[in-house]
Each structure stands twice: as structure tokens, then as C-alpha cells.
Design a protein with these regions (language model features):
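Conserved GNAT acetyl-CoA-binding A-motif
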Residues: 90-102
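Conserved active-site alpha-helix within GNAT-family acetyltransferase domains
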Residues: 101-121
Length: 130
């Protein structure tokens, strides 16, 4: 898998992810929460050949990076792990990295150094230990 990074308003981003973010099956996996982007986002997109197999949009706010939703084809943990490793390596270690993580992926985040801060029914707020 190759991971590419695109700014939140990059034309290529829309070409790559539009078929997914408007797909009812992908939206269902995201609990019908819409994906959004602005110029403050960097998208980490996992590609296999010419196909998108996952993505993590990361919003850069003043004092933190935020992962608020993401998509991984077939819920493959290995894809999620590779995308997360890229996010961690490409974000400034001096800035907090937090995630609203699906309950079913909490262990992958823990393996990569995230700690739980708050648990809800479907999600866990997690913070990267830096």
C-alpha cells in the first residue's frame, strides 16, 4: 500500500474520495456521519494500484491535530495501522494528536501509543502519547 497526502482543498482529493464519501455503504460504516474537509485538513490516503483502500483526514487546529472520522475498506486493521503510522510520523510531535476512534479500532490505536480519554457507545476519544 502506498500512502499519499493531499491538502483538504486539493482537486485530486475530490477525484479520489468522492465516490467513497458519497457511497451509502461507506457512510453506514461511518455511522452516517458525513465526511468534511477544509484547507485546515490533510488527508492521508491509502492506495493499492489505483484504488483507494482507506483514508484518514486530519484537521490541524491551533493546538492539536484531530482525527474525527476515517475509512478503511473491509475494516482491515493492517490498512488502518499503516495509515495511522504515516499520520504519526508526518505530524509534529510537539502538537497533541487526538482521535475520535471507532470502538472496534481502539486496540489498533492503543498499539500505536494512544490512550483512552473518554468512552461513548460507538466511539472512544483517544490521545497520542508523545
Amino acid at each position: 500500500m502506498q500512502v499519499i497526502q493531499l491538502q483538504g482543498n486539493d482537486k485530486r482529493l475530490y477525484e479520489l474520495v468522492a465516490p467513497l464519501v458519497m457511497n451509502p455503504e461507506v457512510l453506514r460504516q461511518n455511522h452516517n456521519y458525513p465526511f468534511r474537509t477544509t484547507e485546515n485538513f490533510v488527508w492521508f490516503i491509502g492506495m493499492e494500484k489505483k484504488n483507494v483502500i482507506g483514508f484518514i483526514p486530519v484537521e490541524h487546529k491551533k493546538k492539536e491535530y484531530i482525527i474525527n472520522n476515517y475509512y478503511v475498506k473491509d475494516n482491515k486493521e493492517e490498512t488502518l495501522k499503516l495509515l495511522l503510522e504515516k499520520v504519526i510520523s508526518e505530524t509534529n510531535a510537539d502538537v497533541n494528536l487526538t482521535s475520535v476512534t471507532f470502538i472496534e479500532h481502539r486496540q489498533v490505536f492503543k498499539e500505536l501509543g494512544f490512550s483512552e480519554e473518554k468512552v461513548w457507545t460507538r466511539y472512544v476519544k483517544m490521545k497520542k502519547d508523545r
